[in-house]
Amino acid sequence: MSVRLHTSAPNKPRKQRARRVLSVVAALAVLGGGLAVGGSLAYGAQGRAGHRDAVIEGAKDLVREDGFPAVLAAVGGRDGRVRDYTVGTGDLETGAAVPVNGRVRAGSNTKAFTSAVVLQLVGEGTVDLDEPIETYLPGLVRGDGIDGSRITVRNLLQHTSGLPDYTQSLPPNPFEIRDTYYNPREMLDLALAEKAVFEPGAKWQYSNTNYLLAGLLVEKVTGRPFGEEITNRIIRPLGLKDTYWPNAGERDIRGTHPKGYGASTPGSPLEDITRLDPSQAWAAGQLVTTPRDLNHFFSALLGGEVLDAAELKEMTTTVPAAEGSPTPGTEYGLGLFRTPLSCGVDLWGHGGSIHGYETFGGVTDDGRAATVAVTALSSAVAADLDGILEAHQHVQDLVDTAICN
């Protein structure tokens, strides 16, 4: 087994964003051979072998024990230096190595980007968090127990709307819909055909429909395509060179990337599902990115480079979100999870699951960052609910190891 180490210098300090200038089970449902290990160690090998080995061993367990084809990770220290890790096989057919910091589908990490765009509009005075979505999308949000005049923008971003999740109405076999293009209104109709789950504001429950509506809100108030807004407001100003919004109908992943794998039913043989129409996720999960870019984004976001102070405070004001989360004490803000780690610090980030890829990560208040990506869903490598939850927890555990050890 080979281990590659190289050093990455810290990024130069970034300028603060001036106003307008830079202008879990439900989530998982969405969206044995040789083992190769690669890593880039930004701190250098001397004196940090324990940290390096802990991350590598945890990543190896994800491949050997949980059955993920590959693991990619980026771990950043307080001084800005970064370690990159790769374990497993990037292409099960050819045996190709896992590319360092390869592109993956971001899944629900997209929600943090989407929320940031909405909160920029709040800062500009064009959107009010406590205004009903009916104000911006009149007559659109209607159904059995569903009334857009009672659901606020905050409810959407916070997952307290009570709206049913449209992904629960999609075919469960990903290979049936891998080439299907869904427009946002079509997916919204799937959700609105179901009964409201609870009264707005009564509780927290994750629903991708909330962020579908957030994307439609952005388009309505800006008059521009959502992908254009997320690119011009977030991706380009932050210099996220490996992150992009796929074009309509774009199914292949651009650039260097490991292949992603899916299963027609939980635990059945893995098949290549890299080529996928991501429209089924849209503003809730369509982005393509890398572990490094996700660390960069969350560091910039929590560092005040994306939002002004008032909007960042709103984003990081949380409610309990233990339901559906394997980690006790987890809370949710506006597009951000706050997850307590074993070393007593909180991780601010998100995570994402979309056919072929699963990610988890974020940043701490003291400047540490870590993102782990695997090239299959937990629901693809495990055959039952307990196994799915266990595999997903192991991905989260590796982030904890990377931050805390």
Language-model features, listed with the residues they occupy:
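N-terminal export and membrane-targeting signals
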Residues: 8-29
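Catalytic loop of the DD-peptidase/beta-lactamase superfamily, centered on the K-T-G motif
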Residues: 2-5, 32-85, 275-405
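N-terminal, post-signal-peptide region of Sec/Tat-exported proteins
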Residues: 79-97
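Short linear capping/connector segments at secondary-structure termini
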Residues: 76, 89-91, 132-140, 170-175, ...
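Short active-site loop at a secondary-structure junction
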Residues: 66-69, 93-156, 198-207, 282
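Residue-level preference for non-acidic, small/hydrophobic
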Residues: 59, 79-80, 111-114, 118, ...
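Hydrophobic (often cysteine-bearing) scaffold residues that line and stabilize catalytic clefts
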Residues: 51, 55, 106, 110, ...
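Short, surface-exposed loop or secondary-structure junction motifs
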Residues: 145-347
